[in-house]
């Protein structure tokens, strides 16, 4: 990915120089005990990508099979699974092609590899943007279902959900094309960082508000049953733990990648930033880990979806 890492992995496999260079030069890699570089083996990249691929394919298949899951909420979850699937496919494809090039099994011209690298970059960038947007859409959908329960089906209709889904995919494609075309502009990187911060803030505000409402509801039930402390405290701890896991996974998996983008703009030549640039592959691996965890958080917790998933695994179509 041209502006994201300190190297283009596919082009680096051919030992050729990219045709375009950044207007800001990244700091040279710094060595020494204070500069930690975490090496990610290609086998681990492939393994994580394949696990994520299988998980998200199962989610899409289960939602497609069960008509009871054909609702806006599950359509958003399905689109999130497709986005995570594309993240995995693009990284697996890039790693596989890179290994074939390095082994001399695949022989092709540098121009062809450059075009392939651009296609993979479009997939990676587009799937990342769509994944962030669908995480935000799921948060908004759940917020409406709690705070506007009686009006939910009139607010979140299927036609409206389809329009939102179409808008997210179109915006993701356009964003990825703009990124590939203008990757040497700092504004593009700042826009991607801004999207991450906006989604993080949106999810934090909505889920914290939902947790507060749930705790308030639990207190009301506890008063009626005259067992206020045990019920309220247990529910509050469980809700806080769920919220911590949800937002914590999002921040830990996506945060380092967007920190990397921010530092490319803020301190591209600083030695300390150069240490962080060396761990770009680690940041990509964390995003793939997020694609593995997303189905566990958003999809597999549904009893209906788990039941359908068992039928899919048993091939009972």
From Swiss-Prot:
Protein's UniProt keywords contain Transport: no
Source domain of life: Eukaryota
Keywords: Cell membrane, G-protein coupled receptor, Glycoprotein, Lipoprotein, Membrane, Palmitate, Receptor, Transducer, Transmembrane, Transmembrane helix
Coiled coil feature spans: none
GO cellular component: cytoplasm; plasma membrane
InterPro entries: GPCR_Rhodpsn, GPCR_Rhodpsn_7TM, Melcrt_ACTH_rcpt, MSH_rcpt
One biological process term in Gene Ontology: UV-damage excision repair
Intervals, Extracellular compartment: 1-37, 94-118, 184-191, 267-279
One Gene Ontology molecular-function label: ubiquitin protein ligase binding
The keyword Chloroplast is assigned to this record: no
Residue spans crossing the bilayer: 38-63, 73-93, 119-140, 164-183, 192-211, 241-266, 280-300
Topology with respect to the bilayer: Multi-pass membrane protein
Residues bearing glycans: 29
Gene3D superfamilies: Rhodopsin 7-helix transmembrane proteins
Residue spans, topological domain Cytoplasmic: 64-72, 141-163, 212-240, 301-317
Tissues in which the protein is found: Highly expressed in the testis.
UniProt function note: Receptor for MSH (alpha, beta) and ACTH. Does not seem to be active with gamma-MSH. The activity of this receptor is mediated by G proteins which activate adenylate cyclase. Mediates melanogenesis, the production of eumelanin (black/brown) and phaeomelanin (red/yellow), via regulation of cAMP signaling in melanocytes.
Similarity-based family: Belongs to the G-protein coupled receptor 1 family.
Assembly information from the UniProt record: Interacts with MGRN1, but does not undergo MGRN1-mediated ubiquitination; this interaction competes with GNAS-binding and thus inhibits agonist-induced cAMP production. Interacts with OPN3; the interaction results in a decrease in MC1R-mediated cAMP signaling and ultimately a decrease in melanin production in melanocytes.
Name of the protein in its database record: Melanocyte-stimulating hormone receptor
Organism: Bos taurus
């Amino acid at each position: 990915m041209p502006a994201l890492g300190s190297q283009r992995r596919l082009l680096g496999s051919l030992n050729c120089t990219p045709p375009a260079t950044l207007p800001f030069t990244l700091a040279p890699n710094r060595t020494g005990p204070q500069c930690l570089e975490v090496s990610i083996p290609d086998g681990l990249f492939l393994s994580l990508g394949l696990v994520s691929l299988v998980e998200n394919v199962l989610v899409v298949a289960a939602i497609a099979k069960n008509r009871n899951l054909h609702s806006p909420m599950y359509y958003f979850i399905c689109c999130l699974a497709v986005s995570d699937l594309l993240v995995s496919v693009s990284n697996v494809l890039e790693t596989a092609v890179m290994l074939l090039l390095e082994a001399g099994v695949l022989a092709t011209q540098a121009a062809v590899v450059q075009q392939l690298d651009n296609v993979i970059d479009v997939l990676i960038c587009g799937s990342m943007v769509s994944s962030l947007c669908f995480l935000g859409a799921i948060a908004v959908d759940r917020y409406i279902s709690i705070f506007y329960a009686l009006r939910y089906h009139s607010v979140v209709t299927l036609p409206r959900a389809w329009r939102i889904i179409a808008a997210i995919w179109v915006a993701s494609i356009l964003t990825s094309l703009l990124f590939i075309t203008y990757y040497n502009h700092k504004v593009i990187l700042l826009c991607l960082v801004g999207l991450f911060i906006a989604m993080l803030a949106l999810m934090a505000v909505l889920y914290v508000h939902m947790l507060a409402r749930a705790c308030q509801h639990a207190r009301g039930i506890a008063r009626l049953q005259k067992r206020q402390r045990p019920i309220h405290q247990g529910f509050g701890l469980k809700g806080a733990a769920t919220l911590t896991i949800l937002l914590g996974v999002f921040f830990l998996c996506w945060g380092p990648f967007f920190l990397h983008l921010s530092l490319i703009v803020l301190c591209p030549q600083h030695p300390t930033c150069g240490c962080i640039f060396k761990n770009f592959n680690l940041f990509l691996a964390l995003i793939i880990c997020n694609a593995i965890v997303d189905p566990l958080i958003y999809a597999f917790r549904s009893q209906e979806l788990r039941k359908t998933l068992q039928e899919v695994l048993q091939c009972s179509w």
